[in-house]
From Swiss-Prot:
One of its GO terms (molecular function) is RNA binding. Keywords: Cytoplasm, RNA-binding. SUPFAM superfamilies: Small protein B (SmpB). Required for rescue of stalled ribosomes mediated by trans-translation. Binds to transfer-messenger RNA (tmRNA), required for stable association of tmRNA with ribosomes. tmRNA and SmpB together mimic tRNA shape, replacing the anticodon stem-loop with SmpB. tmRNA is encoded by the ssrA gene; the 2 termini fold to resemble tRNA(Ala) and it encodes a 'tag peptide', a short internal open reading frame. During trans-translation Ala-aminoacylated tmRNA acts like a tRNA, entering the A-site of stalled ribosomes, displacing the stalled mRNA. GO terms for biological process: trans-translation. It holds the Pfam family SmpB. Belongs to the SmpB family. It comes from Zymomonas mobilis subsp. mobilis (strain ATCC 31821 / ZM4 / CP4). This is SsrA-binding protein. GO terms for cellular component: cytosol. PANTHER family: SSRA-BINDING PROTEIN, TMRNA-BINDING COMPONENT OF TRANS-TRANSLATION TAGGING COMPLEX. The keyword Calcium does not apply.
């Protein structure tokens, strides 16, 4: 069985990645969303700060909100600086929001941010995935598969 490959969005500079999510969740569908940010948040992201490791997205009242994402205050900001962990509105088409709403209403499904990046036009984008939490035995299978691939590469390298 071939591995599931997510669609490739045009990413010019990846700012933050949720690498743990690939281990904890099985992804089903991917979306690209814009973020409604303030000026100091954009400046802070351009300096390479920001984390989406413990964040998730919530679909409520026809809107998608990014919860618990950390974008630190801009170092040269003044009294207009932003709150680091405030909820941020995600910009998606209505059709995509409805699809997310129906997917999340099923048991065990959630919306997880996978990566935060600037696209080629300089806009901050967030790659979202509709995901199902993995069970412990699924995580073990992932570890075994990764170890086997590493061993294969080592064997091929040593023989050649």
């Amino acid at each position: 069985m071939a591995a599931f490959r997510p669609p490739q969005f045009k990413k010019s500079k990846i700012l933050a990645e949720n690498r743990r999510a690939r281990y904890e969740y099985a992804f089903e569908d991917f979306y690209e969303a814009g973020l409604a940010l303030t000026g100091t948040e954009v400046k802070s992201l351009r300096f390479g700060q920001g984390s989406i490791a413990e964040s998730y997205a919530e679909v409520k009242n026809g809107e998608v909100t990014l919860i618990n994402a950390n974008i630190p205050e801009f170092s040269h900001g003044n009294r207009f600086n932003h709150e680091p962990k405030r909820p941020r509105k995600l910009l998606l088409h209505e059709r995509e929001i409805r699809k997310m709403q129906t997917a999340v209403s099923r048991e065990g499904m959630t919306v997880i941010p996978v990566s935060l990046y600037f696209n080629n036009k300089g806009k901050a984008k967030l790659e979202l995935a509709i995901a199902r939490g993995k069970k412990t035995h699924d995580k073990r299978a992932t570890i075994k598969e990764r170890d086997w691939k590493r061993d294969q590469a080592r064997l091929l390298r040593d023989k050649g």
